[in-house]
Swiss-Prot record:
This is Cdc42-interacting protein 4. Keywords: Cell membrane, Cell projection, Coiled coil, Cytoplasm, Cytoskeleton, Endocytosis, Golgi apparatus, Lipid-binding, Lysosome, Membrane, Phosphoprotein, SH3 domain. One of its GO terms (biological process) is endocytosis. Required to coordinate membrane tubulation with reorganization of the actin cytoskeleton during endocytosis. Also acts as a link between CDC42 signaling and regulation of the actin cytoskeleton. Binds to lipids such as phosphatidylinositol 4,5-bisphosphate and phosphatidylserine and promotes membrane invagination and the formation of tubules. Also enhances actin polymerization in the vicinity of membrane tubules by recruiting WASL/N-WASP which in turn activates the Arp2/3 complex. Actin polymerization and dynamin may promote the fission of membrane tubules to form endocytic vesicles. Expressed in adrenal gland, aorta, brain, heart, kidney, liver, skeletal muscle and spleen. Residues 484-547 are annotated as: Required for podosome formation. The keyword Ribonucleoprotein does not apply. Residues 293-547 are annotated as: Interaction with PDE6G. Belongs to the FNBP1 family. Residues 294-323, 420-485 are annotated as: Disordered. The F-BAR domain binds the phospholipid membrane with its concave surface. The end-to-end polymerization of dimers of these domains provides a curved surface that fits best membranes with around 600 A diameter, and may drive tubulation.
Length: 547
């Protein structure tokens, strides 16, 4: 698929898309520049940190260097310093290979894009100029024809006038002949201009603009490929320093393992052993005459409980009223504001995302079940009851995700049927609509009342729910509202219908409708419009899909 064939009439769309692609390229270059600044700042801060904590005295004058802990710390700082050097290499590599090269490439792409669109606009201007010339020749031809007709009428009138002189009649005939000749020349000029414009228009739509669009497509694909390679440079810059960073990390590990606590104790003994004898016992001194008053228990303060009250109040504030007002996003949740093909793609993405989340939750549920079995068999490893809240939460998530999957599957099926119906519409777009049925449509109000009474009858026959059974929380609210009749299918209007007679409803070509009642053999079908309104339309004007 190429732009020149599929997007032949989307000049502005291609202009915006190619501009967006270049903006994305510039955005990535800017991101890498800031990433380079972060890496440079990170390396600089690491080096400053190492310099701050390195011993200030030489090793021979520093007694602490004899401890393995200090030696390991110094070695650790040196490895961090080497690590900072590798971050500087990453920043340098990204600055050269991404910032400089991609910025230069972006400028080249902008110049190429500008050239292609200038060429396209010139072609459009030439076609518009040709159309203006065609209109001028057409108006001239029309004007000359009127003048020729007027001159012919004048000559005929003078020829029949007995009071007119022969010279006047002859002059009028010559004038009529001249006007007729001028009209013939204008006709030939108009025909030539029309032929030239049709040739230029065919060349414009079938050759010139498709070539320009194909060039734009090639340019955009090259830009996207180069941008993808630029994305990969981030990981390549990291992979280049991974071996050295691995050695730095290995050095840190060796430094950590080289700490010898026993030897450090011996070093401390050797450095600070005094050699003095331990002091002897002290003699008893009696001070029993001095009695210290023991403070009473009543002097001790007790907490007033206010923190607990505050905690309780904060917990109460943390609760949310379940019937609070929520932002309604139902209108755009099914992406119905998008074109059918775009809606299908977005719904497909949402469905795949929900399936991945569902699979993740199911895997987590299986893992929790296995862990619970292990706890039940080996109680000392853990309490099986402690896993119940997590298992219940996982089951709730699974049920919620299953409902969402079903919802998106239904929307996706509807969107796919709409896409297929729209494709079929393109084949029958310009065909003549069939004649509507000669019989009058049924009475829509009586049909609605019948269906409503039937629904009420069915609802009255439902048995009441027993105690102990699961009942929806909001049942009492649902009972206050009578649900409208559910559609039995979907349909698309193939032709435009005015709906001027009683009981009918108007519809536009390509409009999506809900099927409320099938054709009873009289040629009429009852439908409901998305924006409201219900009535009958000719069955032959619809493409129907039953649920």
């Amino acid at each position: 698929m190429d732009w020149g064939t599929e997007l032949w009439d989307q000049f502005e769309v291609l202009e915006r898309h190619t501009q967006w692609g270049l903006d994305l390229l510039d955005k990535y270059v800017k991101f890498v520049k800031e990433r380079v600044e972060v890496e440079q700042s990170y390396a600089k801060q690491l080096r400053s940190l190492v310099k701050k904590y390195l011993p200030k005295r030489p090793a021979k004058d520093d007694p602490e260097i004899k401890f393995s802990q200090q030696q390991s710390f110094v070695q650790l700082l040196q490895e961090v310093n080497d690590f900072a050097g590798q971050r500087e290499l990453v920043a340098e590599s990204l600055g050269i290979r991404v910032c400089l090269e991609l910025a230069k490439y972006s400028q080249e792409m902008k110049q190429e894009r500008k050239m292609h669109f200038q060429e396209g606009r010139r072609a459009q201007q030439q076609l518009e100029n040709g159309f203006k010339q065609l209109e001028n020749s057409k108006r001239k031809f029309e004007r000359d024809c009127r003048e020729a007709e007027k001159a012919a009428h004048t000559a005929e009138r003078l020829d029949q006038d007995i009071n007119a002189t022969k010279a006047d009649v002859e002059k009028a005939k010559q004038q009529a002949h001249l006007r007729n000749h001028m009209a013939e020349e204008s006709k030939n000029e108009y025909a030539a201009q029309l032929q030239r414009f049709n040739r230029d228009q065919a060349h414009f739509y079938f050759s010139q603009m498709p070539q320009i669009f194909d060039k734009l497509q090639d340019m955009d694909e090259r830009r996207a490929t180069r941008l993808g390679a630029g994305y990969g440079l981030l990981s390549e810059a990291e992979l280049q320093v991974v071996p050295i960073i691995g050695k730095c990390l290995e050095g840190m590990k060796v430094a950590a393992e080289s700490v010898d606590a026993k030897n450090d104790s011996k070093v401390l003994i050797e450095l600070h052993k005094s050699g003095f004898a331990r002091p002897g016992d002290l003699e008893f001194e009696d001070f029993s005459q001095v009695m210290n008053r023991v403070p009473s228990d009543s002097s001790l303060g007790t907490p007033d409980g206010r923190p607990e009250l505050r905690a309780a109040s904060s917990r109460s504030r943390a609760k949310r009223w379940p019937f609070g007002k929520k932002n309604k996003t139902v209108v755009t949740e099914d992406f119905s504001h998008l074109p059918p093909e775009q809606q299908r793609k977005r719904l497909q993405q949402q469905l795949e995302e929900r399936n991945r989340e569902l699979q993740k939750e199911e895997d987590q549920r299986e893992a929790l079940k296995k862990m619970k079995d292990v706890y039940e068999k080996t109680p000392q490893m853990g309490d099986p009851a402690s896993l119940e809240p997590r298992i219940a939460e996982t089951l709730g998530n699974i049920e919620r995700l299953k409902l969402e999957v079903q919802k998106y599957e239904a929307w996706l099926a509807e969107a796919e049927s709409r896409v297929l119906s729209n494709r079929g519409d393109s084949l029958s777009r310009h065909t003549r609509p069939p004649d509507p049925p000669t019989t009058a449509p049924p009475d829509s109000s009586s049909s609605s009342n019948n269906s409503g009474s039937q629904d009420n009858k069915e609802s009255s026959e439902e048995p009441p729910s027993e105690e102990g059974q699961d009942t929806p929380i909001y049942t009492e609210f649902d009972e206050d509202f009578e649900e409208p009749a559910s559609p039995i299918g979907q349909c698309v209007a193939i032709y435009h219908f005015e709906g001027s007679s009683e009981g009918t409803v108007s519809m536009s070509e390509g409009e999506d409708l809900s099927l409320m009642e099938e054709d009873k053999g009289d040629g009429w079908t009852r439908v409901r419009r998305k924006q409201g309104g219900e009535g009958y339309v000719p069955t032959s004007y619809l493409r129907v899909t039953l649920n």
